[in-house]
């Protein structure tokens, strides 16, 4: 566990999560600014969030996995895909990155366009219960897309994971904006809420909904649909950060990379 945390690769991954989340939040929230001469549309905001997540997943995904989302990180922990310490460090990096991205946007945007900095809220008479279920469903489909498109066990061509994930985020926003402004990501909700000091009584919705939705997707995907044939000791080693994959796993990783490179050209 200590070896993992002290490695250069681990530190780079944590920084990549911070940077990717910062950029994602900056561009996502920036698309929702209410400029007097050009009010944002639902399509514009949806595409911006999708393009931002897809771009960062493509750019920094090879370094950290490109989570940029506490719900996804916790779901991967539930699915026994990452170590406990990695999850903790990623969560901190994501939350700090989200605050930094929102802070930069707040400093750049003029007062008349800044408004509430796109803080998530319950819209159109949506109740807290309805909002939680909506966020669960929205994040559930995102998490399934992430798990499937990045599964190293898949040998058939899967196209671009970054594109798939970007489209999944766009899809979620096209529906979710009408309910909650669409979170699907506790960091995205937390960052602007901190900068604007606007924690509503329903802020918990944007944590519970996405986390439960993503965790449910992890249980279904990693334990029911496509379970890993790992021993208990291997699962504990993954959780501790001491697991070392065998050569067959590494070879399958290389084959998948070659497949993805071919489909990208």
Curated annotation (Swiss-Prot):
Protein encoded by which gene: AQP5
Record organism: Ovis aries (Sheep)
Query: What information about domains appears in the record's comments?
Result: Aquaporins contain two tandem repeats each containing three membrane-spanning domains and a pore-forming loop with the signature motif Asn-Pro-Ala (NPA).
Q: What is this protein called?
A: Aquaporin-5
Q: In terms of domain of life, where is this protein from? A: Eukaryota
Function summary = Aquaporins form homotetrameric transmembrane channels, with each monomer independently mediating water transport across the plasma membrane along its osmotic gradient. Plays an important role in fluid secretion in salivary glands. Required for TRPV4 activation by hypotonicity. Together with TRPV4, controls regulatory volume decrease in salivary epithelial cells. Seems to play a redundant role in water transport in the eye, lung and in sweat glands.
* InterPro entries given in the database record: Aquaporin-like, Aquaporin_5, Aquaporin_transptr, MIP, MIP_CS
Give residue ranges on the Cytoplasmic side: 1-12, 61-65, 75-87, 148-158, 225-265
Residues with an annotated glycan are 124-125
Q: What Pfam families does its record include?
A: MIP
Subunit field text? Homotetramer; each monomer provides an independent water pore. Interacts with TRPV4; the interaction is probably indirect and regulates TRPV4 activation by hypotonicity.
Extracellular side stretches: 34-39, 109-126, 180, 192-203
Q: Which residues lie within the membrane without crossing it?
A: 66-74, 181-191
Entry's CDD domains?
MIP (cd00333)
């Amino acid at each position: 566990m200590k070896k993992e945390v002290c490695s250069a690769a681990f530190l780079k991954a944590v920084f990549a999560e911070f940077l990717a989340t910062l950029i994602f939040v900056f561009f996502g929230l920036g698309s929702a600014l209410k400029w007097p001469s050009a009010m944002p549309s639902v399509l514009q905001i949806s595409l911006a969030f999708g393009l931002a997540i897809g771009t960062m997943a493509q750019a920094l995904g090879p370094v950290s996995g490109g989570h940029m989302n506490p719900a996804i990180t916790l779901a991967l922990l539930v699915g026994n895909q990452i170590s406990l310490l990695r999850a903790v460090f990623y969560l901190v990096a994501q939350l700090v990155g989200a605050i930094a991205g929102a802070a930069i946007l707040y400093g750049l945007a003029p007062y008349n366009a800044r408004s509430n900095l796109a803080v998530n809220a319950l819209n159109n008479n949506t109740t807290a219960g309805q909002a939680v279920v909506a966020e669960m469903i929205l994040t559930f489909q995102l998490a399934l897309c992430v798990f499937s498109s990045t599964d190293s066990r898949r040998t058939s061509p899967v196209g671009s994971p970054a594109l798939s994930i970007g489209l999944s985020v766009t899809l979620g926003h096209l529906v979710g904006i009408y309910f909650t402004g669409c979170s699907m990501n506790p960091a995205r909700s937390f960052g602007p809420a901190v900068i604007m000091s606007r924690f509503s009584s329903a802020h918990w919705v944007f944590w519970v909904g996405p986390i439960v939705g993503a965790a449910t997707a992890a249980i279904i995907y990693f334990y029911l649909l496509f379970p890993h044939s790992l021993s208990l000791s291997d699962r504990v080693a993954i959780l501790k950060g001491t697991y070392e994959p065998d050569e067959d796993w590494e070879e399958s990783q290389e084959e998948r990379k070659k497949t993805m490179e071919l489909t990208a050209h």
